[in-house]
Amino acid sequence: MAPLIIGHRGASAAAPENTIAAFREAIAVGADGIEFDVRLTRDGVPVVIHDRSLHRTARLPHRIADLTWSELQPLDQTVPSLDELLTLFESNKLLMYLEIKCDSAAERLPLVEASCKLINQHSLKEQVIVGCFDLPTLKVVRQIDPEIKTAASFELAISTASPLSDQRILAQAVSVDASAVALHYRLARKRLVEKAKLAGLWVAVWTVDDPTWIERARALGIDALITNDPAAMLAAR
């Protein structure tokens, strides 16, 4: 079965990442879903941005956690709110992969509560998967709303002396009752994918822009590929 194609931060190869323009482009080229990152402003508004500060995307020194939503408004469409994003695309029946970004334990509960509230307000439980690299955050999602699907995200271990084994990855995902795993492409080993599927986990792989991954994903049984260039990946599918 062909994998779903999910636009990483929208169609970020064609438009600025995590902007409405990037998400519209992903939809225009036929992506099956969009992936985006969510952080919390100082006044508790979930906004769509990957980095903790505006330095890379807007060349400004401010941290998102130090700004209010109104203070972000002059940036035009650079940083949309989660509410705005869900409002615009709730009728598209897209898969929405919402990656929670929190820099401290203190941010965890308010960010998860605010995000889950909006998911419910927009009646998007069937379309949204909430992912995070921080496993305790996924536990909080489950506690707040057990019906919202979650994905345990895994990147390559920083230390090669302690690589992430298949057993460790699956054990961590199961420990937080995750619905899915999102694997760095170098972790997408045949045995791991097979074990994840046997455990009933949905499997996504990130971030891949090489069209040869389409056939690899089909052969391995990978459910979705997260890509910066959904147009190129869809052309190969």
What name fits each language-model region?
Residues 1-237:
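Phosphate-group recognition and catalysis centered on beta-loop-alpha active-site segments
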